[in-house]
Amino acid sequence: MIHIGHLIEEELQRQERSAAWLGRKLYCDRTNIYKIFKRESIDTDLLLRISKALNYNFFQCYSDRLNADM
């Protein structure tokens, strides 16, 4: 199973950006970003916004998993 929150947190760290930075990009408080890190799943609209903010296609993770399982 993909834990999307962990993947988002890892990518944010890889880019050397903070939760506060992502919060500003998403117009939410950094405490909400920390809650996102703990989520195993996420709303697609929110994932799209995060993908755009980080310039990273998190949907590809699901696509790769789907292809591997077929």
Regions found by a protein language model. Give the residues of each.
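A short, Lys/Arg-rich alpha-helix, primarily the initiator
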Residues: 1-17, 21
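Recognition helix of helix-turn-helix/homeodomain-like DNA-binding domains
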Residues: 27-42
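Short C-terminal boundary/hinge segments that cap the last helix of small helical domains
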Residues: 55-70
